[in-house]
A protein has these predicted regions:
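Catalytic Walker B motif of ABC-type/P-loop ATPase nucleotide-binding domains
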Residues: 60-63
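Conserved catalytic motifs of ABC-family nucleotide-binding domains
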Residues: 56
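Conserved ABC ATPase signature
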Residues: 35-39, 43
Length: 150
């Protein structure tokens, strides 16, 4: 299918079947006939993931997927990203500024400061000193779970 076909709504039956299948897998089938403006921020993020999955990617780039989402919606989106990665064997690069989410959902963290990598390793190896280096702030000024860490 070309981009022009998509603009004019000329989708094949196979495209429609795949879209419905992915919508069901992501828990969005009930919103099939809703306009985008009627969806919550978390639902919109999930729709974005569905749209990406329709392209059958080998890599999924997620730039701040939970920014501006409430905690419950953020959890749903992060769980979906992890599920998509595991079930479809798709590598996911997720850019997050929420330390708590990175620690909870990611197996590997690449922390950068000033355009340079200051940490690249497993989540379990990330120390408070490394977090301070990544954010260039003492732990007492950083928040996790709505509370200062230190």
């Amino acid at each position: 299918m070309s981009a022009l076909d998509g603009v004019f709504g000329r989708y094949t039956e196979e495209d429609k079947r795949r879209a419905l299948s992915i919508l069901e897998q992501t828990g969005l089938r009930d919103f099939l006939y809703h306009r985008a403006g009627e969806l919550s921020g978390g639902q919109r993020q999930r729709v974005g993931i569905v749209r990406a999955l329709m392209q059958e990617p080998s890599l999924l780039l997620c730039d701040e997927p939970i920014a501006s989402l409430d905690p419950a919606s953020a959890q749903v989106v992060m769980e979906l990203i992890c599920e998509v990665s595991a079930k479809r064997n798709i590598a996911c690069i997720v850019n997050l500024h929420q330390i708590e989410a990175a620690l909870k959902y990611m197996g590997r963290i690449i922390g950068m400061y000033g355009g340079r990598i200051v940490y690249d390793g497993p989540t379990s190896g990330l120390t408070e000193a490394m977090i301070e280096k990544i954010y260039n702030k003492p732990m007492s000024q950083l928040m996790i779970g709505g509370e200062a860490i230190a």
